[in-house]
Amino acid sequence: MLLIIDLQTAFINWFVGLGVSKDISAALWIPLPILVVIVGATIGVLVIVWLERKISAGVQQRIGPEFAGPLGVLQPLADGLKLVFKEDIIPSKADIWLFTLGPALVVIPVFLAYLVVPFGHDLVVADISLGVFFWIAISSIAPIGLLMSGYGSNNKYSFLGGLRAAAQAISYEIPLSLCVLAICLLSNSLSTVEIVEQQSAYGILGWNVWRQPIGFVSFLIAALAECERLPFDLPEAEEELVAGYQTEYSGMKFGLFYVGSYVNLLLSSLFATILYLGGWTSPITFSIPFQTSEIEIFAAFLGIGMTLLKAYLFIFLSILTRWTLPRVRIDQLLDLGWKFLLPISLGNLLLTASLRLAFY
């Protein structure tokens, strides 16, 4: 049984009960979902930064942050405030427009992609029929911002980092898209909500990860490369390029690159959950014979918690990968994308299409 909560109707009725007119209540609802997405993604980034510090400390047998709040949970907030109040320096020979627009062009598309991420049947800002392809298309804009930042800095290390970012994005965007296309072919839909609902019938046994194991592994590798996580962080390799395209940046512009990186990591983990692990659905199927407002609220929180739990499992694996695997060379990175992942993901798509024609 699908437990559906209509948040818009509940919100408007609640304000009408307080004496606010229905038109004003409907107008107040319009910016609320976008505001919730921005605040939620920002809080998710703070949690990821804290987890990265604590997990890396555990891998290296250290304690990690412990003074800024209990268990150091306020350390990411302190780091963010430090970057906000630092001086914003623009190199004298840099292209001011490219240098300034680059970080914004990296962050804004990633936040826009959250509009199609569902946390429940009606817990999605925009349930569009091309939700999956909207994510792929909008996330393809970020490498342009990285290239602009590297070119506009008028620095050889920044320019090389921007070129590497563009080459890496092109190399791994194609296998990632082919893996997603196989899921869409299997689900007969491009809507993120319908893809999750298609996996909800048999609990954990209905998840796409069992029907697409090759695509799942290929998707994870390509997603790590798209997020520029170790062992694929060639665009900002410290030993080779100082800080890559970030070399000349300081203050809040420098912080925007980190925000974009972690927001993109959370977004990729959420889409891995949606496409392969059933999204908000529980591993164990259950049905409730009646439906009340309290049960609807409980179902909404259960869906959000289930989605985030699965997503943070991927984030934990990516953090563990960063601190346990060495960085690959740029030629190895491109060989992995073009000579290994591309043929495998293409073969997986052809196999999925063949099985679809044979058994459906």
UniProtKB/Swiss-Prot annotation:
A UniProt-annotated Pfam family: NADHdh
Keyword Plastid: yes
Keywords: Chloroplast, Membrane, NAD, NADP, Plastid, Plastoquinone, Quinone, Thylakoid, Translocase, Transmembrane, Transmembrane helix
Catalysed reaction equations from the record: a plastoquinone + NADH + (n+1) H(+)(in) = a plastoquinol + NAD(+) + n H(+)(out); a plastoquinone + NADPH + (n+1) H(+)(in) = a plastoquinol + NADP(+) + n H(+)(out)
UniProt keyword annotation of Transport present: no
Annotated PROSITE patterns: COMPLEX1_ND1_1, COMPLEX1_ND1_2
InterPro entries in UniProt: NADH_UbQ_OxRdtase_su1/FPO (IPR001694), NADH_UbQ_OxRdtase_su1_CS (IPR018086)
GO cellular component: chloroplast thylakoid membrane
Enzyme Commission identifier(s): 7.1.1.-
MF GO annotations: NADH dehydrogenase activity; oxidoreductase activity, acting on NAD(P)H, quinone or similar compound as acceptor; quinone binding
Biological processes, Gene Ontology terms: aerobic respiration; photosynthesis, light reaction
Subcellular location: Plastid, Chloroplast thylakoid membrane
Sequence intervals crossing the membrane: 29-49, 96-116, 128-148, 166-186, 204-224, 255-277, 297-317, 333-353
UniProt topology in membrane: Multi-pass membrane protein
Reported function: NDH shuttles electrons from NAD(P)H:plastoquinone, via FMN and iron-sulfur (Fe-S) centers, to quinones in the photosynthetic chain and possibly in a chloroplast respiratory chain. The immediate electron acceptor for the enzyme in this species is believed to be plastoquinone. Couples the redox reaction to proton translocation, and thus conserves the redox energy in a proton gradient.
Family under the similarity heading: Belongs to the complex I subunit 1 family.
Matches recorded under HAMAP family: NDH1_NuoH
Subunit structure: NDH is composed of at least 16 different subunits, 5 of which are encoded in the nucleus.
NCBIfam families: PRK06076.1-2, PRK06076.1-5
Protein name listed in UniProt: NAD(P)H-quinone oxidoreductase subunit 1, chloroplastic
Native source species: Chlorokybus atmophyticus (Soil alga)
Lineage of the organism: Eukaryota, Viridiplantae, Streptophyta, Chlorokybophyceae, Chlorokybales
